[in-house]
Regions:
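Hydrophobic alpha-helical transmembrane segments in multi-pass membrane proteins
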Residues: 14, 22, 55-61, 174, ...
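N-terminal leader/targeting segments
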Residues: 1-84, 173-176, 196, 200, ...
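Membrane-interface helix/helix-cap signal primarily in integral membrane proteins
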Residues: 2-5, 64, 68-251
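Alpha-helix C-terminal capping segments
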Residues: 49-52, 84-87, 112, 212, ...
Length: 416
């Protein structure tokens, strides 16, 4: 079969591109075009696509239009959820702590989810510090009366902090004074199954972190160990983050694809018998998702687990595991579940890195003459170099755009 262009070799890539285009359009037109309008457009285009089964070209166009409208509808719906009306006045509410409380001067900062409002609200909270606030842990319930406000930007800041909070699910911010709250047992039944599961996972992770402290880890050693193994970066100091960022190794502290990939590779070596391939892949994926649950089901870890799951299923079909289609399937699954991930820096960087490895790894590998490249030690070093350079080609523009810097030590750091 002939194809009129290389892109037709990657059908899922086209679906992903139209879905992304729809998400971008839906976000830009939010407020001007309603979710109902996007839903109607999705339904109509899907109906015509089903009716046009005898006209392949027309049906293909209509399917892509359906993906476009679907992306717009999904992002519109998610924006509706985070753009809830906030009272803007002192409000009484019950909530549960859903992030590791962090001491910052005279306040303790943490995330709360309300459990007695019409819809649960995720709140970025600052609690005036006292002995009770210092003892707050993930999963603790509180009853409070405080001013709930929509996220706003800091005066004179270039970074759009309000947009960042909204796109990460925060509905409001609040400051809680000493006499405005008390600990309480709260009912979590109004929360979704996913929210309750995540809270349970975070409570379990908190117990594991306490084990690290009991074993004698403290200071920077504890902070790095907690970040690399359980994804808790709350103890990392700004100085330590800066050192890792300058050295080009900040990705080591962000529990994501690198760490899950190592776990997947080790488990694959342990379960390498070919005749038990299906069983071994199921066991490996169960282990991966169990780990995702233990570390709190953060966005970056879930994203990486989805990519590994797609990779695993593709390997069972004896297809090219690391291809544009595989990457596109992962993108479609993730964005269909949470379209605002598209605006997450971690999402953009992880997919850019994998995309450029797929595109540039082989050409970079062949830059070195085969007679030299086939020497075992040189081959291994050059393969690592090619992967690192290809990934950096993809993420360098994003790093420069978002952080205004680029590490020149990435090759040496990644080798180590």
């Amino acid at each position: 079969m002939k194809t009129n262009g290389q892109i037709q070799l990657y059908p899922v890539l086209r679906v992903a591109l139209f879905l992304i285009a729809g998400i971008v359009s839906g976000e830009l037109l939010y407020g001007a075009v309603s979710c109902d309008a996007w839903f109607a457009a999705t339904a109509v285009s899907l109906m015509f696509a089903l009716l046009a089964y005898r006209r392949c070209v027309l049906q293909t166009v209509l399917i892509f239009l359906t993906c476009y409208f679907l992306g717009a509808m999904l992002v519109c719906r998610e924006l509706d959820e985070v753009n809830m009306s906030v009272p803007g006045e002192d409000t009484a509410y019950s909530a549960v702590v859903v992030s590791q409380p962090v001491v910052a001067g005279k306040v303790v900062k943490c995330d709360l989810i309300t459990v007695n409002t019409h819809r649960p609200m995720k709140i970025k909270a600052s609690i005036y510090r006292d002995w009770r606030a210092d003892r707050l842990r993930i999963g603790n319930g509180i009853e409070a009366v405080s001013l709930l406000e929509k996220p706003t930007n800091y005066a004179g800041a270039d970074f759009d902090y309000a947009r960042y909070l909204l796109y990460h699910g925060y509905v409001a911010t609040t400051f809680i004074y000493i006499d405005e709250w008390k600990g309480a047992a709260v009912d979590l039944s109004r929360l979704s199954v996913v929210q309750r599961a995540r809270i349970s996972a975070l409570v379990f992770r908190d117990k594991l972190l306490q084990r690290f402290s009991d074993m004698g880890f403290n200071g920077q050693a504890y902070a790095v160990l907690a970040a690399m193994t359980l994804g808790d970066k709350s103890s990392l100091s700004d100085e330590l983050k800066e050192e890792y960022s300058v050295s080009g190794a900040s990705h080591v502290l962000a529990l994501s694809g690198l760490h899950l990939g190592i776990i997947y590779a080790i488990l694959s070596l342990l379960f390498s018998r070919r005749r038990w391939q299906i069983v071994s892949q199921v066991l490996i994926l169960l282990a991966i998702w169990s780990y995702v649950f233990i570390v709190g089901m953060s966005a970056s870890v879930v994203r990486s687990a989805v990519m590994l799951t797609v990779y695993s299923f593709v390997s069972l079909l004896n297809r090219n595991r690391l291809s544009l289609n595989t990457l596109s399937v992962a993108a479609v699954v993730i964005l269909a579940g949470s379209p605002l991930y598209l605006y997450d820096v971690g999402f953009q960087m992880s997919f850019a890195a994998v995309l450029f490895i797929i595109i540039f790894y082989r050409p970079l590998l062949e830059v070195m003459p085969g007679s030299i490249r086939n020497i075992p030690i040189i081959k291994q070093i050059w393969q690592m170099t090619a992967v690192s350079v290809a990934a950096q080609i993809g993420v360098a523009p994003l790093i420069a755009f978002y952080f205004g810097r680029f590490s020149c030590y990435f090759l040496l750091t990644n080798m180590i």
